[in-house]
Amino acid sequence: MNDFGEEDERQILEGTFVDKSSKQTTNDNENNNNNNNREEENENQDKNVTTKNDEDNNNDANDGDDDDDDLFGDKDLEENDNVNSDNEKNKSKKDKEDQDQEEQQEDQEDEEYSNKKKKKKSKKNKNRHSTEEDETMEDANENLDFATGAGEEEEEEEPELIRDPITLTHIETSNVLPAQKIMKLKLLNILGIQPKPFDPITFEDEEAMNGDEKSKFNVESVIRWRWGLDLNGRPAKESNTRLVTWSDGSSHLYIGNEVLEIKEQPLQNEQFYVYSSQDGFIECEGKIDSRLSIRPTNIKSKVHQRLSENVAKRTVKVSKIKSIHTTLDPEKEKEKREKELLDALREKKKQKDDSYRPNRGRGGKSGSLTASYLENDDDDYDSYRNEKGDDFVVDDDEDEEDDDYKESDDDGSDSSDDDGSESGESESDSDGDNKSKKKENKNSNDNKNNKSRKQDFDDDEDEDEDLIVSTKKVKRRVIDDDDDDED
């Protein structure tokens, strides 16, 4: 591992760091290789020199005359000097060649590093979503890889896709004049355009089919065109619309007798183009330069009046809320009806209760005190007594008379007591006979009503029984006293 200082880290982040240790190691290796090659060459040269010397000696031996001339070996020394000089020259050449190779290698490495850096930068420019931090980190990683020798492999280039050639044909458009200026127009509900040529035969059918579109604008405010004949008898296009530009720069659109004001606004920051589409591709016709806005000339114009009428008609048809005019408060009317219903229910219930209630003097409500009312009351009570199976009649008036009669017997003489007792017995017997006859005559008529009235008397049954028992005791006591007097 290489130890990097603060300056090395700063150079790595800036992308200017160069690893010297790796270059030194590579240079040392190359120098060692060169030295080894040089030693081998020197050995070969020495061998060649020795072989030459041997050959020369052999030649000298053969030629004795020559040996005599060269007794001190000057020739050999000269030849050795020449060989050494040649070797030195060769070494200097090889050193120069080695230096040149080293310089070339360094240049190649620098070029490769710069090329890699350029590729990385081009990729970073293409990737718009990368941030500055990512770029700095990538540069640092690249420098580290290059310094340590880890990123020496060349990046694989993406293979180019070879696609089938596309044959483009010009899109045939309508034979119109070339547009000098293309403008954008937004259609409002006061204006319509009919792209099909006008035909008086099919006009009514088309308008009937396009009822929804017809409701948006009037027939008179629709831009139309048709085929006609010019002065030379050739077919030409005719339209009911004219665009007039005045000297002051203002423009008006005439549709028949209708006049509309036009204002042009340039498109500054917007980019709109007109395209002609075809299967597989589209063809650009031109750029939209400006926008047109159309409006009525004034409020009193026919177009504006017709538009307001159509809007009013649509609002009347579409409105679903219905209003009702009334002078009475619905809440009070509702309370009044509820009160009347409650009163009717109370009256009905009251009548029903009165129909089931008996006509008695004791207890419930009664009518006026007439003879018939009193007789009916007695009859009701007598019928109730007959149902109980008791023939004894209880009468409060008779009890009071008996009590008075008893007191008179105590105060008077014995003869008067006998007369009073006989007269009291005779009166009681006569009254009992008369009442029994009346009972027999009325029992037949009252039995039918007794069943319905019996239920109403169930609550008063206990009180009636107590009253009957008390009256029996009083009556019997009086009769027993009379019997004792007779004895």
Curated annotation (Swiss-Prot):
Record localization: Nucleus
Domain of life: Eukaryota
Biased composition (Basic and acidic residues): 86-97, 344-357, 382-391, 441-456
Residues that span the membrane, as ranges: none
Pfam families membership: Leo1
Residue ranges that the Swiss-Prot or TrEMBL entry lists as coiled coil: 331-357
Ranges of biased composition (kind: Basic residues): 116-128
Gene Ontology BP term (one): transcription elongation by RNA polymerase II
Chief localization: nucleus
Keyword Protease: no
Bias (Low complexity) ranges: 27-36
Molecular functions per Gene Ontology: RNA polymerase II C-terminal domain phosphoserine binding
Skewed-composition ranges (Acidic residues): 56-81, 98-112, 132-142, 392-431, 457-467
InterPro entries in the cross-refs: Leo1
UniProt-annotated stretches for the region Disordered: 1-142, 344-487
Assigned keywords, A-Z: Activator, Coiled coil, Nucleus, Transcription, Transcription regulation
Keyword Transcription regulation set for record: yes
Family: Belongs to the LEO1 family.
Assembly description: Component of the PAF1 complex.
Known function: The PAF1 complex is a multifunctional complex. May be involved in both initiation and elongation, histone methylation and RNA processing.
Record protein name field: RNA polymerase-associated protein LEO1
Organism: Dictyostelium discoideum
Gene that encodes the chain: leo1
